């Protein structure tokens, strides 16, 4: 499954790179209004007091129908606003919040994320096979 991500400060980009996931797309100001054609998992940071970054919201306005899950990065110093963008997206679009991780994640976070993406790939494959 495609992993679409937004990295304001480079932390999420480093997380994705360490996870060695190849089917990815980085949301930027230049492509945030681009329509994609396949289901995806979103990974995003949180800005301000728990807000969804504007490029992510613009992307979701167009592509939310293909969103299957979300993971969020944040800083625990923000307390209850830690990775709040993930919770907001999960609630708004009724998709699972797969995980929250701090800054660029630990090795355990990366392993957990890879496992969850792998499970989505297996489940999505089964759905495709069963739909025949």
UniProtKB/Swiss-Prot annotation:
Taxonomic lineage from the root: Bacteria, Bacillati, Bacillota, Bacilli, Bacillales
GO biological process assignments: protein modification process
Functional note: Probably involved in ribonucleotide reductase function.
InterPro entries: Flavoprotein-like_sf, RNR_Ib_NrdI_bac, RNR_NrdI
Record gene name: nrdI
Identification of the protein by name: Protein NrdI
PANTHER family: PROTEIN NRDI
Pfam families per record: Flavodoxin_NdrI
Molecular function GO labels: FMN binding
Family, per entry: Belongs to the NrdI family.
């Amino acid at each position: 499954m495609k992993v679409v991500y937004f990295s304001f400060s480079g932390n999420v980009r480093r997380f994705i790179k360490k996870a060695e996931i190849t089917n990815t797309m980085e949301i930027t100001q230049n492509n945030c209004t681009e329509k994609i054609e396949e289901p995806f998992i979103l990974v995003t940071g949180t800005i301000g007091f728990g807000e969804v970054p504007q490029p992510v919201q613009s992307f979701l306005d167009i592509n939310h129908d293909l969103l299957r899950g979300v993971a969020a990065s944040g800083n625990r110093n923000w307390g209850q606003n830690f990775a709040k963008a993930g919770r907001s997206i999960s609630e708004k679009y009724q998709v699972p919040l797969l995980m929250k991780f701090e800054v660029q994640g630990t090795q355990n976070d990366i392993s957990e994320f890879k496992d969850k993406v792998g499970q989505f790939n297996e489940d999505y494959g089964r759905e495709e096979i069963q739909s025949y």
